[in-house]
């Protein structure tokens, strides 16, 4: 009764739905909902998808951002990121501190970062045979802020990359024809739609996807 929001730790998606069905007087935010240790974050889409159907569910926090590791040299003088147990200490939590979506040290993106990046995107592209539906989930930003590139590949090999002019207003959607038609020759064709920064920002260079 004294808080402005409801917060729980690692509830299931169904538990969140059940809670909001009984009491939606406050927004629901998971104080922690995925643990980015090892090869993880594979099911987080179930939670991010929930934001599309439950307005009072407003997301959550990942544990955590950066591996809690430090530089150490091995016996050959080569640096590596060390964690529990690498200094001969006992007891220890071993690699339990290595649970970030960015590596320690230079903070390079780990493979888990790609999963997080995809699920946190504010623009969705739904591709059909000859068109693409662009859904803009941004609250204030038009899609013309970005350069939209559409890439056609066959059996994993890029055939063409074209620019698609889009201008989808915030919280709306629009369908555009693809710059290439339906392919007739046999093979597995894939279409990749990317939105890239037109200009450099404080957090990324121009061209960042």
Show which residues each predicted segment covers:
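A short, sequence-level motif marking secondary-structure junctions
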Residues: 10, 166-168
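Beta-strand-rich binding/interaction modules
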Residues: 131-166, 175-179, 187-197
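Short beta-strand elements
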Residues: 200-209
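Extended substrate-binding grooves/exosites of carbohydrate-active enzymes
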Residues: 1-131, 138-144, 149-157
């Amino acid at each position: 009764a004294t808080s402005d929001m409801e917060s729980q730790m690692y509830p299931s998606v169904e538990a969140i739905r059940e809670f909001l069905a009984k009491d939606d007087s406050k927004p629901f935010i998971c104080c922690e909902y995925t643990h980015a240790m090892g090869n993880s974050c594979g099911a987080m889409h179930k939670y991010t998808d929930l934001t599309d159907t439950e307005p009072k569910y407003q997301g959550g926090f990942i544990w955590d951002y950066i591996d809690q590791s430090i530089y150490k040299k091995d016996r050959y003088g080569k640096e590596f990121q060390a964690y529990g147990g690498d200094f001969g200490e006992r007891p220890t939590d071993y690699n339990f501190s290595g649970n970030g979506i960015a590596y320690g040290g230079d903070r390079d993106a780990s493979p888990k970062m790609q999963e997080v990046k995809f699920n946190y995107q504010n623009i969705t592209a739904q591709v059909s045979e000859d068109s693409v539906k662009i859904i803009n989930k941004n609250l204030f930003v038009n899609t013309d802020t970005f350069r939209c590139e559409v890439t056609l590949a066959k059996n994993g090999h890029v055939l063409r990359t074209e620019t698609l002019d889009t201008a989808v207003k915030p919280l709306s959607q629009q369908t555009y024809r693809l710059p290439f038609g339906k392919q007739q020759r046999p093979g597995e064709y894939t279409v990749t739609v990317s939105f890239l920064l037109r200009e450099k920002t404080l957090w990324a260079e121009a061209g960042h996807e």
